[in-house]
């Protein structure tokens, strides 16, 4: 169930989140980078070039709902190096609240751009799949690694849709 106080606090907390080293805003309690597709691609490419980790999240309504009850999942979004709006409802809400988030940045579209980057960076970019429906990450890993593109899947994990605590007690 939603915590109304938390949701209202997230709505009222419109200020820039100053504890990040980038232009991040709070949207219903989650950090969202104020970037479009071009800047998101630039940041990922810069991380690849500099050989830095770039853990990015693609919040949508499902993320917002999951983050209300799953602390571990919420913390993973907060710890992301890049958090882009993957859902139009989030973009509309940001606009309504006056946040400078102007466009949807679908993770799948960002992924497709990076698939063609092998020549640009001189090697395949290592990716790790996390989450999704049962078996989807494994299948995506196999398909990606059998293709001739700029990405290689180095692993995947699908912990299911329960909380970390629930899965640990099984």
Describe each model-derived feature in a short phrase.
Residues 7-109:
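N-terminal nucleotide/polyanion-binding subdomain common to many enzyme families
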Residues 91-170:
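Conserved beta-alpha
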């Amino acid at each position: 169930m939603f915590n109304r106080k938390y949701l209202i606090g997230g709505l009222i907390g419109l200020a820039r989140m100053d504890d990040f080293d980038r232009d991040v805003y709070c949207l219903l309690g989650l950090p969202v980078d104020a970037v479009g597709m071009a800047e998101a691609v630039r940041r990922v490419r810069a991380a690849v070039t500099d050989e830095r980790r770039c853990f990015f999240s693609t919040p949508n309504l499902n993320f917002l709902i999951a983050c209300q009850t799953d602390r571990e999942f919420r913390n993973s979004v907060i710890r992301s190096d890049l958090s882009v709006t993957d859902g139009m409802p989030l973009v509309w809400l940001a606009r309504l609240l006056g946040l400078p988030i102007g466009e949807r940045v679908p993770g799948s579209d960002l992924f497709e751009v990076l698939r063609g980057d092998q020549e640009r960076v001189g090697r395949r970019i290592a990716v790790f799949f996390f989450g999704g429906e049962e078996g989807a990450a494994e299948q995506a890993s196999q398909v990606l690694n059998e293709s001739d593109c700029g990405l290689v899947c180095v692993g995947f994990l699908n912990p299911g849709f329960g909380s970390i605590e629930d899965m640990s007690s099984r």
